[in-house]
Amino acid sequence: MPESKYRQQTIRAPRGTVLTAKSWLTEAPLRMLMNNLDPDVAENPHELVVYGGIGRAARNWECYDAIVDALTRLEADETLLIQSGKPVGVFKTHDNAPRVLIANSNLVPHWATWEHFNELDAKGLAMYGQMTAGSWIYIGSQGIVQGTYETFVEAGRQHYNGTLAGRWVLTAGLGGMGGAQPLAATLAGACSLTIECQQSRIDFRLRTRYVDEQAATLDDALARITRYTREGKAVSVALCANAADILPELVNRGVRPDLVTDQTSAHDPLHGYLPSGWRWEEYQKNAQSDPHGTMQAAKRSMAAHVRAMLAFSKMGVPTFDYGNNIRQMAKEMGVENAFDFPGFVPAYIRPLFCRGIGPFRWVALSGDPQDIYKTDAKVKEIVAEDKHLHHWLDMARERIHFQGLPARICWVGLEWRQKLGLAFNEMVRCGEVSAPIVIGRDHLDSGSVASPNRETEAMRDGSDAVSDWPLLNALLNTASGATWVSLHHGGGVGMGFSQHAGMVIVCDGTDEAAARIRRVLHNDPATGVMRHADAGYDLAVECSVEQGLNLPMVAATQGKG
């Protein structure tokens, strides 16, 4: 069978209440798969690429067609199995089992390298699923905006007396993930200068209001930043250039930003990071003709990029890795002190993870933005005392452009996820919203990932690389009745550096859905509290006691068992 990764076809999820599949439990994954490939959502939908270098929704177009057909036919007591973007089986299970189980990009550890993966990919035997690309719950750049916003806000608290007014962030990358940075900085009160080597990505971010302005030159960009910071305005500026050139130049000029980070697709040197002096078309061509040489050229440029970040850090500028593994790539090219600046999780986010707080997201399958606005109001009603969360929801409504099906994200923890899910399900039952809602999350969450250079960097007990935790998370979500569950490898930081799990559950207004929601939206964040309590974090232990978790070894350690 010929296999095609390119098709000139526009995919959009159906809207409204007319079903293509046999129930909302199978209509939901069908619509979310299609939504991942909506041209307003995906970076390169004609090649099935959703975000993050080559993060795909399906292995090839033949597989996509087969997945759509299988979901359309799937019965209420059947489960579809997806192996690296390919539908490989439909099995009889039961009504409360997941309707889809997904495994993407998983390799035996010794073979978990980009070189081996690329060989398999070329043979049509594997697919890189990133995190939410291959698990069909990507919602565009909004999916990471609040996490980036929370990171910048916490950096402001730690370094600048609680405010980023009059400050500016230097970063790079305006792809599916990096595109969130300028808007997050603006919402946090800071100016930003984001370097991006592809004009098309800048154009997209300007069109969707994630970036305010584009500068013509570096001098122009710096003049704008100087003017806006002096005036106390939070304005985002993009510059079309290569970060491997611009950051060293800024160091040479003695320019001093207030925060430095990066969200280029450095995790994938073959497809995601343009070598200095190359054009993008040249990069794509060389990736096919000379993959090893291309990867080495990209990593040499990353080394220059990281040396500049280290120089900023040495100046006293708060500098952090935003989870793209650029430090690792630089270290492999001889930058021995690449890890002298921290990752964003140990620096700013881990206390949230200890309480099971992470990226809770939901999507209106109706396609009606009013359904999201009604759920926004419901969140404010239930989480009544959290004014920081209310402020986020207000800013999100004002500034965030929906991509594809309307969606929202807000970071909430173990205490609230189940309550919100049950409330959404009741809204569907009562007709307050016009169609069912799906609830999911990023794989970047407190209990669903092992990634020693990102989410689990510098764990208190040294368990950074232990990947039992995401496996247990996936197993528990399956046992709890999530609508679909995914287990991936390599997301965010690339092959060999992470394992992670995802889940999505449908709120269709039924009593059966409510029972599943009670289990899934408690157990899923509870695994994060469990994981951090097991690692010895007092905040997580306290949360486990408050929420009544049964953690035998933690209880024994605390003298309670």
From Swiss-Prot:
One of its GO terms (biological process) is L-histidine catabolic process to glutamate and formate. The active site is at 410. Its EC number is 4.2.1.49. It is an enzyme of class 4 (lyase). Pathway: Amino-acid degradation; L-histidine degradation into L-glutamate; N-formimidoyl-L-glutamate from L-histidine: step 2/3. NAD(+) binds at residues 52-53, 130, 176-178, 196, 201, 242-243, 263-267, 273-274, 322, 492. It comes from the Bacteria. The keyword Cytoplasm applies. It holds the Pfam family Urocanase_C. It catalyses: 4-imidazolone-5-propanoate = trans-urocanate + H2O. Its cofactor is NAD(+). GO terms for molecular function: urocanate hydratase activity. Keywords: Cytoplasm, Histidine metabolism, Lyase, NAD. Binds 1 NAD(+) per subunit. It is found in: Cytoplasm. GO terms for cellular component: cytoplasm. Belongs to the urocanase family. Catalyzes the conversion of urocanate to 4-imidazolone-5-propionate. This is Urocanate hydratase. The gene is hutU.
